[in-house]
Amino acid sequence: MPRDIPATKGVYLLERVTNKEINLENIDEEMRMEQVRQAGAKLDWASFGQAVRRNLQEKRNTIDADGRIDVLKSLAFMKTKLPIEADAPMEEKIRILAESLGCTHVRTTRGWTITKPEELNVDLTIKNGEVDTVVLSFWEEAAFYSGEATKMLHKGEWSELRDRLASMLAVYNKDLDRNDRKTCKAAMDVLGSMLKTMNADEMYTSIQNNNYGYYLHRSDLRQGRLYYNVEPLYRRVRSKHHTYSLQKEDWDILPFFEFSFVPSDSVHAFPEHNPYGEWKETGSAKAAVCLKLSKGVLVSEPTRRKLHEISARSTTIQCYTNCYRYLTGSVLIKDNLKMITQFPGECTQHHYTIDRSSFTSEGDSVITEIYLKRLQDFHKVIEILRKEAMHISIWESVLADCYELQGLEERVVPAINMFVNLSRDMITVRFMTKYAPIRVCIRDGVWIEAKVEVVNDQTGAKVADRVDELLTRKLNETWSIPIMLTFAVSGEDCALEQMKVPLREENPETKLPTPTKIIVHKN
């Protein structure tokens, strides 16, 4: 029988407050129970019980369905990463290799064939129970014998081969439909032809100065790579070994990006083959161009905004940070950061005081992928990344020349006080000379270079054009503020301060890997 429950006019929650804090969990629980009581007042208890069971059943089914989807996704991902044991039976290795690539496999008179329609075909010739030859075909292209793949299987590197094949297939995302994939592949062929014509030679300086960098064309099991930046310091280090052009040992060290294509909500224009060899965007596809960076690239917030202007969607961000603080390692910055150069001998040192405000913003980031609307805009990305690399490297040069090794002998050195302010628009260095207060301003130039301007800090008047030209040339040759400033000022021009070094009793930056430039500098 229905139970008569009087309607409740109001809810009064009495909570004993301890330690002057409100127990929100108890309040939430009491409110939920009151909702149950009010719902029970409208139903007999039998109907109420049925409603509760029905509600719980719906939730359980929903949770189970979501759980099943997650499990299926996890299993699918695990299949792509399952290790292939070298000592497993041949049929087992073939099966795992095929399933992890989403392919079918069939036995042939000569061995095995692994196939994924329109994407991959692998023919394995078996002799005496071992793989004798590997013939590959990607995206319905002409088949070719792959010596690299054959050597890998002779060494038992089945898992490594699977990963390399998966990387090749990732150029065209599996979610692209057939027509869009064909359009993207045609665009990639046009790009490859253009880069073959416009490619720089393998000299480090040519790679740095060419609008399109240097394109290392695709190999059997490696995507094409576009190298876009070779810093002056790297060139100097390699020149000590009489190396001035790109070598195989440079391939995984120098920064590069790879091209791939991913689905997009919007339709974008793509180039197609033209009998006159012209770049004309006559094709279209619901796809975007992905530039996958070889490693995370540190960029400032203004630079990320520039990339956004030509992007189909937001860049892939690994983490947010402050780009200047990011490079200092674990040095604790409570106030203005103070550093002193480690010039050899009796040289006058530079004592830098970097304004603390330079390290407070958290809008900078480390990015790993850039998505373009138009394929031809990749050269704009090259220009943006080169300028950003130069800006970051200029700040890193201060860290490198001020790096204090553990166990330095305590001593007193003469130093020039310099005050530094860091921002993406301009780096300023201020110091007092016997003649006037000086401000050195460093900005991006028109081309991929920095521009230096030296002015009177009080009046803003330029010191001399020839000084600007000299310092601009030195900075672009070295990407180093300390080296550049040695041409701007000497101990005879300034009132020197006697500084006790090292500045820190211990160097926390040695506890973690130091920036690449510092490592190279130490060698």
Curated annotation (Swiss-Prot):
The keyword Electron transport does not apply. GO terms for cellular component: nucleus. It is found in: Nucleus. Its main location: nucleus. Keywords: Activator, Nucleus, Transcription, Transcription regulation. Coiled coil: none annotated. Component of the Mediator complex. Belongs to the Mediator complex subunit 1 family. Component of the Mediator complex, a coactivator involved in the regulated transcription of nearly all RNA polymerase II-dependent genes. Mediator functions as a bridge to convey information from gene-specific regulatory proteins to the basal RNA polymerase II transcription machinery. Mediator is recruited to promoters by direct interactions with regulatory proteins and serves as a scaffold for the assembly of a functional preinitiation complex with RNA polymerase II and the general transcription factors. This is Mediator of RNA polymerase II transcription subunit 1.2. It comes from Caenorhabditis briggsae. The gene is mdt-1.2.
